[in-house]
Every structure is written in C-alpha cells, then in structure tokens.
Amino acid sequence: VFETRSFRLKGYSVLVGERPGLRAGGVWSETCVFCHNTVPYFDALWGELAGPGAPTYQGTVVDRLLPRERRWRYEVGADGDGLLQSAVAAEVAAVGGTPARDGDDRRGVLAHGIRELRSRFGARNFVEIGIGCEACHGGSREHVVDPRVHPDFAPRSAFLNARAEAGGDVTRAEQVNRVCARCHQVLFSRYPYTWEGEGRRGGKPGGSSITSGEARDFLLGGCARQMSCATCHDPHTEDRRADLDRLATTAGNAVCVRCHPQYAPAPALAAHAHHDPTGAGGSCIACHMPKKNMGLGYALTRYHRIGLPDDPARVERDRPIECALCHTDKTVADLVGKMEAWWGRKYDRAALANLYGTVDARPLQATLMRGKAHEQAVAVAVLGEARRTEALPGIARQLVNPFPLVRYYAKRAVETLADRPCAVDLDRTTPEIVAAVRACVPAAFPETVPAALPAKPRTRTDDTDED
C-alpha cells in the first residue's frame, strides 16, 4: 500500500472470484482482533466447546479441520459446567455484552458469547494492543510475582482439560506449535480447495495454499511432535531474511539430521535425494517444504506441511508436480518416470492425463490453462522467476483471471520477464488491461484476446464458508 500508493488485495483473505460492486466493510473486531492482539486463550476455545454448527469467528481453534491423530480434545470436568458458564458470562460482561438467557444450556451460552465477542470486542478491551508476552505464554501472573517460575505453554484451567484425542503424552514441541496455530491457522477463507486434500468441506481437508496457515500445515506433517515452529523461527523478533534463506540450503540440513542422522553423510544424502548433495537439490527443505504457497508480496512462500514430493496424493491430485518447480523444462512423463525409477512409486497415467491434458505436457504450462486458481498462481510465479519467456502469452492470460489475486501474481511475472514495470490497473475491464499490457510488452498478447471477466456481480452465496 505505502510503496505503490494504492490499495492492494491482501494475500490470504481474498482468494475469491471477481465480485463487482463489493463494498469495503471489514470490521476490525470481527476479522483481525483475535490474531493480531493478546487475547485470552479461553476465548479462542468457545467454538470448539460449543461443537459443530456454532457461530464462527477469526482466531477460533479449529481442531475439527485436522486429522483425528493430530487433534486435541477440550473437555469440561464433571463439576465444571457451572464454572465454564460463569467464566463465559464474565468475559461477555467485560466487553459490555448482554448476558445469555436464563436456562440456556452450555451450547447456548457459548453461542451467545461468540456473537457478543464478534460484535463488541475492541481496542478498549485490551491491556495492550498487539502481540504481548501472554499471547503465547498464557496467564503468567506467577512468573511476574516470582521470575524463577517460568511461564508454561500448556493450557491450565480449574474446569477445562486439553488432551491429545489419539491419546499419549503431549510433547513440549506440540504445545509450542499449538500456541503458534492459534493465529497461523488460516485455511483458505472462502476458497474451497486445498493441497492434497478433499477441500475445506471434505472429510480430509489438506494444507492451505495461502500465507498465515503455516502452523496448521506444520501440524499435518510428520515432524510436529519433535520439532517446533521455534526451531526455525524466533518468536521474539522478526526473522532475518538471510537466516531463512540459509535454512533452504544444504547448511540448513543440520536441523533435519538431528532426527534423521542417517542422511548426514554426503553419500547417503545423494542416494536418498538423487541430486548433488552439495547443490540446491541436496537441500532437505527444497524438496520437503517447496515454495508453493501465496505470500502477501505476490511471491511464493514455503508450504509448511513437511511431506514427500513423490507422495501420490500430491502427484496425482495437485498441479503442478513439485519437481517442476525447479525442473521447469521437463514434461509430466519425464518427472513421474524419474520418481518411479528413484523411489519405486507407480503413478496413474490416466489421472495425470486428466490433470494436464497429456503426460507429454510441461506441468507448469499446462497448469496455466487447466489449473485451479491457487495452482495457476504457483505456475505464474515460478515461470516468471525462471525467466521462461516462451510462457509469456500464457502468463499474460492470467492478467484477466476471474480471481483478482492471481492477476497480481501474473503482473509481477510479466514485469519480471519484461524487465520493467507496466502501468496496468488490474481492476479495469479486460480490453483495457490487454491494451495496457500490449503497450508495455507487445509479445504478451500477440494474437488472441482472453475472454471477458464475469459481468454479473457475485453474491455472498457464490463463495463457500465465512472467513
């Protein structure tokens, strides 16, 4: 906003189709307040305690969108119902809300409380604005009284218990990751699709394609019991770009070999990765946390579900194949053939042909034409950064994508390929956008003009669930 002196679309919350006539109307207390400030953990649990069908709100714990083996269960003790309802009533009164009706059961009290919080919680209710110590460390009165008592990450309550639904002990790393996931859990807003899943409303929602969902995505992977977000990120200061970049090199493998020491020797890593162990392909993160999520600056960030690039759920459901993020010149057949030879997989060629049109297609270029919106954004960004000038016409078509966010990725890619900025207003009509881009980069639209954007204003029911 400040650099361009113009309004821009925020990366994670607006992956929705074109909606002409939409008026700005975000309410801070409803959409921002719970993640960008220090709010009692208890307030984030009301939706989970009320159960399915409860009113939704930003900042609520969303364990139901995790696989069962990753969920926590929040339970009220046998004698705790009255204490719970009294605590909810006290929170509602603190924000100036009205009490629940006499005789309401626990669910009714919680649902009423959620509506009151959504409409009334504001700046006047905070001890401090922004993220303070207790946003992560919970109530820390004992630590203030006696600094020798260290704050804890585990939730504590006289009437409420938290436990792993699958049983077993909860590790400290899991507790830390849960703290991060209170805010970094945005899934896909109204956008229904996910990575390697059935979508938001399916039985197995996968990983997010947007920024701010990193902690939830991390919980989906296999490392979240032993490794915490704080292993790579300093929660007390902004990460230095150089430090994050180093993690994506072979030097960053030192983090991974703490638990996977068998890959520390270079020959073992080469046999595992089938790449030069000293080069970019020898980085653990490069393959297991690929850059394919949409960030706020119209550049890609890393997908935080630590997994396998050869996983059939990724290869046969998602576009583009992750190996194509580096190997932009290879075809689908080239890439899956290598994965089958290297790791003993067997992929469904018919499913791949359905995704890409043909297995002889290059995954990124085919994704431009056939992909879902989040997949198209990835293809656009990668082809632009790779300077694939032959893909320019396909990238330029995304400048009139029905999803405005994808257009911004396309504009950045076109400008990267052209090596200069283009004065293009992406909120204009299709003919105006095409004319402006042709004036800047004639090769972008050599012949055909893309179809016009949707003319009918979209309504709220055109999208999926609330944010």
Language-model-detected regions and their locations in the chain:
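Amphipathic alpha-helical scaffolding segments comprising HEAT/armadillo-like alpha-solenoid repeats
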Residues: 358-367, 388-400, 419-428
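Hydrophobic residues within the alpha-helices of tandem HEAT/HEAT-like
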Residues: 413-419
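Conserved hydrophobic register position within alpha-solenoid helical repeats
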Residues: 379, 410-411
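Alpha-helical scaffold repeats of the Armadillo/HEAT/TPR superfamily
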Residues: 394, 423-447
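Primarily the internal scaffold of c-type cytochrome electron-transfer domains
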Residues: 1-16, 41-382, 386, 405, ...
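Compact, glycine/acidic-enriched structural inserts
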Residues: 26-27
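Eukaryotic intrinsically disordered, low-complexity regulatory tails and linkers enriched
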Residues: 447-467
